[in-house]
Each structure stands twice: as structure tokens, then as C-alpha cells.
Amino acid sequence: MAHPHLLAERISRLSSSLEKGLYERSHAIRLCLLAALSGESVFLLGPPGIAKSLIARRLKFAFQNARAFEYLMTRFSTPEEVFGPLSIQALKDEGRYERLTSGYLPEAEIVFLDEIWKAGPAILNTLLTAINERQFRNGAHVEKIPMRLLVAASNELPEADSSLEALYDRMLIRLWLDKVQDKANFRSMLTSQQDENDNPVPDALQVTDEEYERWQKEIGEITLPDHVFELIFMLRLQLDKLPDAPYVSDRRWKKAIRLLQASAFFSGRSAVAPVDLILLKDCLWYDAQSLNLIQQQIDVLMTGHAWQQQGMLTRLGAIVQRHLQLQQQQSDKTALTVIRLGGIFSRRQQYQLPVNVTASTLTLLLQKPLKLHDMEVVHISFERSALEQWLSKGGEIRGKLNGIGFAQKLNLEVDSAQHLVVRDVSLQGSTLALPGSSAEGLPGEIKQQLEELESDWRKQHALFSEQQKCLFIPGDWLGRIEASLQDVGAQIHQAQQC
């Protein structure tokens, strides 16, 4: 076997050659190439005139000496037009019912069948055997067929509960194509002088028969790690819970796993990685509604679980909660104690701030969070002058909740221990405390836990950075995963600054 990274580079260059002159069809070419290299079938859905047949023709050039067969189905198509005419000579001389298959589907490596759902039962039944077993019954004997890729196309989906569903289920990869959208690409397409039938692939990049056969065995040796299987099973369970989710047969799941193995193999890896699971978005949908649903569920899986994003956020939440508990315990020791002034004959007890409290704005921590003015509050900012006046003369006192917005009216009092206590509408109280010294930093317990969490985050990010070098995964999906990991990293960093 060639060095894995050299193989990945070769397949990337092969795909680039196949994509030349085809605009906004890179993803379709790459998945069709992956299907061809792993012996799977593809269904292309889209309106006429969007290069569906050209995609199939291009794939012929991925292989040395590959033969192609393409046919436009109609309601009147006969098996002879797809599988070859009957041999009159064999029937006449020997009484044998045998087809002349040269130039037809049974002898082609690349097959393109347009308007596939118009095929009659006789064609469909033979086609199912060809896809499932790679065999063709020709008269009294069974012939092995060399088909590596079947591309079926239509501008419509098969009718539900029809005889076509069995064939549709065999189409592992399903791609929904549309017209060229980008203005620059549209102009380039209009003005291109390239002959679409020219071979764009250098001989050195084409796949030989020996390589293809060897790769089929090596694809099967790619492992499925436990954590990747758990992600697949999580997706399956989630789909089973959704009433509008499409039915996915065990056969389709099994074939999809082989496609993931092929993705890993041709990306230079020895095991399936979470990033390969994005391919399932093109394997599990049935119609327009399920296409969106499948993409949403896989997006949740990739941005929330595949690299432990949600698990790390849950751990972070527990660490932050523990830090709050420690701060509240510390606030008992650092509760702000005001000084009682003399004047026993005064109608109102007067207080003043300690002499060491000199800041013009005071930020005081709540021993326990309270809901004040419809906000969960953990600290209050007071103007020192306003607090001093309230301690001396009483009246109304206002403070900024969590240090933001306008100062809000507060229910504040001094308790018997000469501590400031703020109360909510239900008169639940929370003692106000001076924040700890910034030099103290995070408690050792919290600091260690955050460092361990940051280390785990770095490992997950490094794994993703290594795995994302996958030709078959669109860049926008990789961008969303990167953003989800960066968000987790930012939240960890923010907690470390507290």
C-alpha cells in the first residue's frame, strides 16, 4: 500500500482534475468519486441541464481503460436497450437464450441511467441484482459484472409505497443539485471553450484495476472506534425518537459505514473519525423534508458532541458552580462590616463605612445569588458617596445589578452583626461582601480543574485539526465545527480570568 498521506494527496489531485470545467459541482464530483472507489451507487436529483450526465461521464476518466454506459429511460425502454440484445445466432444454432452484452451495462465499469424512475419492472428487477450482487444472469449462466459506479438521475423522487423504493434504497449517496448560482461561475460556464468530453486526468493519476481491487480489501480493514460508534448510535436513537424522521434500514446503515471507512482510507487514516460522519447527511434522507431534518440532527451531533463540546461545557458549568460556592463561603469571612456611630438618643441608628474602604465605586458580592428586578444577581455596584449618605441618613438606595445598566432601587438593611443585607421581593436576604483581593486569584482546586479542562479542550481541537483534512467534507461544515470548539475555548478562558 502507498503511504497513506501520498494516497490522500493523489486522490485529491485526481478529484481536482475531474472537477475542471464543472462549476459548483465539486462536492458532487468528490462524492461520486468516493462512491466509485468504494463500489457504491449515487442518485442525483435535480432539473434537466445541470450536468448530471457530465458528472457520470467524467468519472470514467478516474480509471484506466474504464468503459461507460449511459441510457435515458422512457416508459417504453426494454431490457435489450440496457442489458444488450438477444443473440439470434445462439438462439438459432443452439437454442440458447443469451444476450450480446458488449457495449451495454453488463460490461461497463461506469453506468449512468437518466430518468431512472421511468424504468419498467423487467429492467428494475435485473438492475437490483446487478447492484446487490454485481452479477448478471445471461441465459443459463451467471456473469460477474465489473460495475464500479452506478449513477442514477431524475428530476423527481420515486412515489412513496411504489415498486421503485427497493431500487431507491440501494442508492446510498443522494445528492440534490441545482443550477449554477454564483455570478462569476455562471459567466465562466457561459464563456468556457473546454470540450466537456476531453479526458482531464493525467495518466499517472488514473486508478488501475489492480489498485482498485486491492483498495476494496483495505477499505474493509479500516476500524470503527468505540467513540465514533457511540456517535452513530446516538444519531440513530435520536432519529428513532422523531416522528418525521425517515426510515433508515439496517442495510443502509451498514453500507453507510463502508462509505465512512472509504472516506477515512482515502484521507490517509486507519480509522473512521467523527468528521467522516458528516457524509451521513447525503446518505440518510429520503425527501426534501427529511433532508433538512437529517442535516439539522447531524449538525447538532457535530457541533455539540463529536469533539465533546457539550461534555466540556457541562464540566465547565460544574466548575463555575463550585467556584461560586467557594466564593460564597469566602464571603462569610469578608462580609462588609459597617461601623456603628454614637448617639444613643438618635431616632435612627447611624453607620459609616470602614476607613479602609476608599474606592469611589464599590462592588459588593452577594453571599448567595438573588433574583432582583427579574435578573439573577451575583454582585451590586454602589457609588461610595450614595452608600455613605444612606448609612448616615437613610432613605432610598440604588445600585447597578451585576454592574450593568441603570442603578436600581434596592431593599437594603444593616443586620445585628452590622453587615449589609439585600433582600428580594420575598424578603429572602443575602449578605454583601467585599470581593477578595485580585492577587489571590482562583482557588487552587478551581485552577487545577480549569487547567485540566483546557488541556482536554486542546486535545479535542488538535484531533479536529488533524481530522478535518478530508476531501469529501464541505468547508462550511468544518467552519461550524471550528466555531463550536472556539466557543468552548473562549468560555474556558473567560472562567480562568475570574
From Swiss-Prot:
It catalyses: ATP + H2O = ADP + phosphate + H(+). Keywords: ATP-binding, Chaperone, Cytoplasm, Hydrolase, Nucleotide-binding. Gene3D superfamilies: 1.20.58.1510, 2.40.128.430, P-loop containing nucleotide triphosphate hydrolases. ADP binds at residues 23, 49-54, 196. Signal peptide: none annotated. It is an enzyme of class 3 (hydrolase). Its EC number is 3.6.1.-. Its main location: cytoplasm. ATPase activity is stimulated by ViaA. Component of the RavA-ViaA chaperone complex, which may act on the membrane to optimize the function of some of the respiratory chains. RavA functions as an ATPase. This is Regulatory ATPase RavA. It comes from Shigella sonnei (strain Ss046). The gene is ravA.
